Regions:
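Elongated, amphipathic alpha-helical interaction scaffolds
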Residues: 1-202
């Protein structure tokens, strides 16, 4: 490993937020969002705005919702969540962020078709879903026809254990790169950059 290389613990709340919101790494953030969602990197670089992470409170008895990172772009709101460990209720907690943001998109008098698309990207430091994959995409579909109910929101889950297992085994990593498409390879390469960030910002 390069002597100036620092191994980042991205599951740390402070490092995760600092890294993704740091002006020195904004290009990585834009590339990351682009690879996951398909939103053009240039558009993200030009129009991205870091939003208030505390969602509006409806009344005094409402539960407070405080997200990790929210990035507003022209037609999308991106919610990045680092899930350092699994516990019962974590999926429901993150879904509550997503659906709360979905409901808060509109002001009085606004057209329902003009709201921003809500996209949640979860980086999971645990294995939860079947298939032994790096990236999982979730939407709401009809059971038999697989028709999308709406395109107004979607959520992604990235498996860090999957990445670690492949990266620490050169044979598996080589096979992984051979067997997966170009998009997968780019995501893997970018996540490796996140773990091995050159510089002294941290």
């Amino acid at each position: 490993m390069h002597e100036k290389t620092k191994l980042l613990n991205l599951t740390s709340d402070v490092i995760f937020k600092n890294f993704f919101m740091n002006e020195n790494t904004i290009e990585y953030t834009a590339e990351f969002i682009n690879l996951i969602t398909g939103i053009p990197k240039e558009e993200i670089m030009k129009k991205a705005v870091f939003e208030n992470i505390e969602l509006p409170i409806i009344n005094k008895n409402s539960k407070r919702y405080k997200c990790d990172i929210i990035i507003g772009i022209a037609k999308q709101l991106i919610n990045l969540e680092m899930n350092a460990s699994y516990y019962e209720g974590i999926i429901e907690k993150n879904n509550s962020y997503l659906f709360r943001m979905l409901g808060d998109r509109f002001n009085k008098g606004e057209n329902y078709i003009d709201g921003k698309k809500i996209i949640q990207i979860n980086i999971d430091n645990y294995k939860k879903y079947k298939g032994d994959k790096l990236l999982y995409r979730f939407t709401i579909k009809e059971d038999e026809t697989l028709e999308l109910e709406t395109e107004n929101y979607e959520s992604y889950h990235i498996s860090l254990p999957y990445l670690k297992e492949k990266c620490y085994n050169k044979e598996k990593l080589s096979r992984l790169q051979e067997n997966n498409n170009e998009l997968y390879q780019k995501i893997i390469a970018l996540l490796i950059k996140f773990y091995y960030y050159y510089g002294s910002n941290y």
